[in-house]
From Swiss-Prot:
It comes from Danio rerio (Zebrafish). Substrate-specific adapter of a BCR (BTB-CUL3-RBX1) E3 ubiquitin ligase complex that acts as a regulator of neural crest specification. The BCR(KBTBD8) complex acts by mediating monoubiquitination of target proteins. The lineage of its organism: Eukaryota, Metazoa, Chordata, Craniata, Vertebrata. Residues 48-116 form the BTB domain. The gene is kbtbd8. Component of the BCR(KBTBD8) E3 ubiquitin ligase complex. This is Kelch repeat and BTB domain-containing protein 8. The keyword Repeat applies.
Amino acid sequence: MAASGDVGKLLQVQNGTPASTSYNGVDALHACNILQQLKALYDEAQLTDIVVEVDHGKTFSCHRNVLAAISPYFRSMFTSGLTESSQREVRIVGVESESMHLVLDYAYTSRVTLTESNVQALFTAASIFQIPALQDQCAQFMISRLDPQNCIGVFMFADAYGHQELRERSQDYIRKKFLCVMGEQEFLHLTKDQLVSILNSDDLNVEKEEHVYESIVHWLEYDCSRREADLPEVFAKCIRLPLLEEAFLSRIPPAFALALSRDSSDKSRLNGTNGCSQRLGMTASEMIICFDAAHKHSGKKQTVPCLDIAAGKVYKLCKPPNDLREVGILISSENDIFIAGGYRPSNSEVCIDHRAESDFWQYEHAGNRWLPRSPMLRARIGCRLVHCCGKLYALGGRVYEGDGRNALKSVECYDARDNCWTAVSPMPVAMEFHSTIEYKDRIYVLQGEYFFCFDPRKDYWGHLPSMNIPRTQGLAALHKNCIYYIAGICRNHQRTFTVEVYDIEQNTWCRKRDLPFDQATSPYIKVLLLQGRLHLFVRATQVMVEEHVFRTSRKNSLYQYDDEADHWTKVYETPDRLWDLGRHFECVVAKLYPQCLQKVL
């Protein structure tokens, strides 16, 4: 029988490598278990060796080694050899009791509970204790809660503590929402340097330089005696004189005109409009965005063309992530672009049962990219998105489940401040290819013989009179306080170009002249509001015979509606076949920034 040493040598020879004499194992749960036991000791006040007293005399018994491990502040205090290192109790000034409780909870559990009421005080405590990871969590929470009412306060707070990311993100938000923010009370409390930092940027979202001037005057008048001496410097650094209208300049009071004329040696303010860069908001152009368009040379590759009708140019928007198709689309009143749901195309040419997605994305104009937001509660294809009462609603759509294709009646609500969705009362019937309109804090939903009104504040659905010619897959638009319902498919499965108008205040329907299209061209129609007027974007197909060979030709055209004449006129035709539009293409109108997009034509 071989001795143990011989067996070891035999194994080395068989394996061809020296046998290992040690084993290095890692217990993945060890750190978590240690943390749990330390938390238990803290909760039971066992083996504690330091008492921390904060504002209002509140005390906390805890462990020096835990505090020193997460905080350089405490590590220095307990190891420096100073008086505090040997004291049983230490007092911390400037930290609230709730904040200290949250810091200790974070130290012993790695978890933190943030609210709008505690986040700034906790950030302050984390700053004092030099815990950057906790500071960053607080900063991200504040960034996620930015709105026109609090962004100035957050910016000033970040500036005071020198947190670069929070300062930059809040400043970017102020510039983006400047017209809303400049009227807020906190705007008047900005320091001169903070005001200049915001106003001297190219990224300021204003359509006229006059808004910048007015905001400075508003800021000055709040504390004129102290700020008057700063006015020439603020004007010199922030106002771009060539961008001010001559008529506006002539109306400026003499004292302000004198301040504007000082520092006239600044060349950037005297070299004419051509040498003075425009603000971001001045470059915005209202464009038609076409979703679910196919690339000209490959039908499988999606592209998102943007038509600047006024300038006669074509741009390209960043396509939806994961090549999502048939998404719900919303352009908010603040020009934010959202997409939700849809499906990812299959590699199979014959697959029609697409898997619904719950993804939710917001478009970032400056970066021409899509930013992820919290996904919907329910995956859905072709849902409708509506902004109402400060929140976003996703209604209906379809999924492929169980016995096949199923329409949905569920509705959910998105709160941007909390970045979360909640379910609300479902629609009375399941719907897909329906139309939704928001008007005076109500959501109107139309499909076939169904016409409903939803009150978000009461979470209640009401019934309204159906249209005269019920039809599905029609198109709805709000124009002059009326809902225009255009085209669709009748009960006999025939397409119709009927136009009906619902007067919301009068609660009545009336007919308008039918659309001037030929059934033979198989037009696919989308309704738009462009420059305040009702338009139709139409994809029409023509069949031509050339030397006994049938050829098809598609044209994409824009028609404008004349309210008084009740007449549609073609006003634009897209460049020939830059892309292909399928049956499920969608068109929306939004203000976009050409310099942020890829130019196509």
